[in-house]
């Protein structure tokens, strides 16, 4: 399959009944699947992991895999292979995940446990320097004075990949909605590389493989610059990206103009999906061929949104960047 192959209908294994969860295509795209844990599965999972507070998962990293096994066992061991199959499938690579009954900020710790279990069935979440943990929770409010667009509510946060300014491989990104008050707008934005109509033009450009400098602002707690190209290929030679407009530092006029044109071509793509993510749900995407961002919010003095993210590497395949590790 080449980079521009049309979506193959995987039929979401439409005839298959899963134990402990359901799986359907999303309303936005057949590439994005919706996975919902049943009320019984959710209840049993939370009961079985109740002995471990979130702090235990922070201090003892092996417990993150333990809670993952508990969740997979409750799903008759069908969950882990389904997650891996979906995320490693170039035609899909994205899930919107929900657990029935987990939908209130009072259940924030339960949300962290659930997301941790899912993430550690596919790999391991990296250390997040911004929070000092394997996950980060942060709040978006009506007024923001931070040093990046992460928390700024009244503008679009442009499409990007995570992990651009760190040396660790970032195969997946998980983004969970923990709380939302007085919110209008702010949908998640997603773009699959193969749905980007300008991919071939920019992937074939001479600057596509030139190593460029990426530097993070102070809030990220990362002081070392990293160098890598915007584009690379996976094991099958298909395009993957490692790009964010805020942190790439062009060294000259040629790079600056090309990056500016690249940004415009991404932001105006007709392939962008707008995905609402209610409280308690989370997106889990393949970071190599999905870009993500956020639409703007409608201003409100008491606007509040709390998010949780995890990002890490796949432990069951080597679909990494091939030429610049």
Swiss-Prot record:
| Cofactor binding mode and count | Binds 1 Fe(2+) ion per subunit.
Q: Which cofactor does it need?
A: Fe(2+)
Q: Which Gene3D superfamilies match?
A: Clavaminate synthase-like
List, alphabetically, the SUPFAM superfamilies matched. Answer: Clavaminate synthase-like
List, in alphabetical order, the Gene Ontology terms for molecular function in this entry: ferrous iron binding; glutarate dioxygenase activity; oxidoreductase activity, acting on paired donors, with incorporation or reduction of molecular oxygen, with 2-oxoglutarate as one donor, and the other dehydrogenated
What is one GO biological process annotated to this record? L-lysine catabolic process
Which pathway does it take part in? Amino-acid degradation
The record's Pfam families line, in alphabetical order, gives:
CsiD
Binding-site residues for Fe cation, renumbered to this chain:
160, 162, 292
Query: Origin, by domain of life?
Result: Bacteria
EC?
1.14.11.64
- Keywords annotated in UniProt: Dioxygenase, Iron, Metal-binding, Oxidoreductase
Question: Which CDD domains does this entry report, sorted A to Z?
Answer: CAS_like
Reaction equations catalysed = glutarate + 2-oxoglutarate + O2 = (S)-2-hydroxyglutarate + succinate + CO2
Purpose of the protein: Acts as an alpha-ketoglutarate-dependent dioxygenase catalyzing hydroxylation of glutarate (GA) to L-2-hydroxyglutarate (L2HG). Functions in a L-lysine degradation pathway that proceeds via cadaverine, glutarate and L-2-hydroxyglutarate.
State the oligomer form and interacting partners: Homotetramer.
Q: Which family does it belong to?
A: Belongs to the glutarate hydroxylase family.
Protein name stated in the entry? Glutarate 2-hydroxylase
- What high-level taxonomic lineage is stated for the organism? Bacteria, Pseudomonadati, Pseudomonadota, Gammaproteobacteria, Enterobacterales
């Amino acid at each position: 399959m080449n980079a521009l192959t049309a979506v193959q209908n995987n039929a979401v294994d439409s005839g298959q009944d899963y134990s402990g969860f359901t799986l359907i295509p999303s309303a936005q795209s057949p590439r994005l699947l919706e996975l919902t844990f049943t009320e019984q599965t959710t209840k049993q999972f939370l009961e079985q992991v109740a002995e471990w507070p979130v702090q235990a998962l922070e201090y003892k990293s092996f417990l993150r895999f333990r809670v993952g096994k508990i969740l997979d066992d409750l799903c008759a061991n069908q969950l882990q292979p389904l997650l891996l199959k979906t995320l490693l499938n170039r035609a899909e690579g994205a899930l919107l995940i929900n657990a029935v009954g987990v939908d209130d900020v009072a259940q924030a710790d339960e949300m962290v446990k659930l997301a941790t279990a899912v993430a550690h069935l596919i790999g391991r979440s990296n250390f997040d320097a911004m929070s000092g943990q394997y996950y980060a929770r942060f709040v978006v409010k009506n007024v923001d004075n931070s040093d990046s667009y992460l928390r700024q509510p009244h503008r679009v946060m442009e499409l990007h990949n995570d992990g651009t300014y760190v040396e660790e491989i970032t195969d997946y990104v998980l983004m969970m909605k923990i709380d939302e008050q007085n919110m209008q707008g702010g949908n998640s934005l997603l773009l699959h590389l193969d749905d980007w109509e300008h991919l071939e033009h920019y992937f074939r450009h001479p600057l596509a493989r030139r190593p460029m400098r990426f530097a993070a602002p102070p809030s990220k707690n990362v002081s070392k610059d990293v160098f890598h190209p915007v584009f690379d290929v996976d094991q099958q030679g298909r395009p993957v990206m490692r790009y964010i407009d805020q942190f790439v530092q062009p060294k000259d006029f040629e790079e600056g103009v090309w990056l500016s044109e690249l940004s415009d071509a991404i932001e105006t793509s007709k392939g962008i999906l707008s995905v609402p993510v209610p409280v308690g749900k989370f997106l889990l995407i393949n970071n190599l061929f999905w870009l993500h961002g956020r639409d703007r919010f409608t201003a409100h003095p008491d606007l509040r949104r709390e998010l949780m993210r995890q990002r890490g590497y796949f432990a069951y395949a080597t679909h990494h960047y091939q030429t610049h590790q």
